[in-house]
């Protein structure tokens, strides 16, 4: 049927030892470890897989639930998922490390496996204004920008969007 696989390299999983040692993606060390992992799977599957995604729904890291799902910044936590402690600083530091890891892996793949096509994906969440009041419209735009465009701008354009400095 001429179906070709599309592999998502990281789909909400992180070895528990790395969560405990580095607090997941908050630890810069995870960048090199991800690169090493990707080099192994690229070599192993170079003749079977052409299409790759580096991270599943990377923008989930902008949310509190992203501590568990995407960035794995939950070192030492053993309670309910609904009560995960939240640190916006840790989440966005972890996201930055994922962006760097993704960029490095894409660069490596293009240099060593020109047949590969690498991309990214987000969990696009539409936000509608509650009313037609200007403040509700602006809030909906703000939610769309921070939830959807922030991560996709970095991954597609290779740089943080202009509003990121205001957000940080």
Where are these regions (language model features)?
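Non-catalytic scaffold segments within catalytic domains of secreted glycoside hydrolases
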Residues: 1-168
């Amino acid at each position: 049927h001429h179906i070709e696989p599309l592999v998502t390299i990281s789909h909400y999983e992180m070895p528990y030892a790395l969560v405990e040692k580095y607090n997941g993606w908050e630890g810069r060390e995870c960048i090199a470890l991800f690169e090493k992992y990707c080099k192994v799977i690229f070599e192993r599957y170079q003749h079977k897989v052409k299409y790759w995604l580096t991270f599943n729904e990377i923008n989930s890291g902008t949310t509190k639930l992203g501590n568990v799902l995407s960035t794995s910044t939950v070192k030492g936590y053993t309670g309910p998922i609904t009560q995960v402690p939240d640190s916006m600083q840790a989440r966005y530091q972890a996201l930055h490390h994922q962006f760097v890891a993704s960029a490095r892996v894409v660069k490596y793949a293009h240099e060593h496996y020109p047949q590969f096509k690498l991309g990214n994906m987000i969990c696009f969440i539409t936000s509608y204004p509650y009313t037609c009041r200007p403040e509700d419209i602006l809030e909906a735009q703000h939610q769309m920008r921070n939830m959807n465009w922030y991560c996709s701008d970095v991954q597609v354009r290779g740089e943080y969007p202009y509003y990121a400095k205001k957000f940080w």
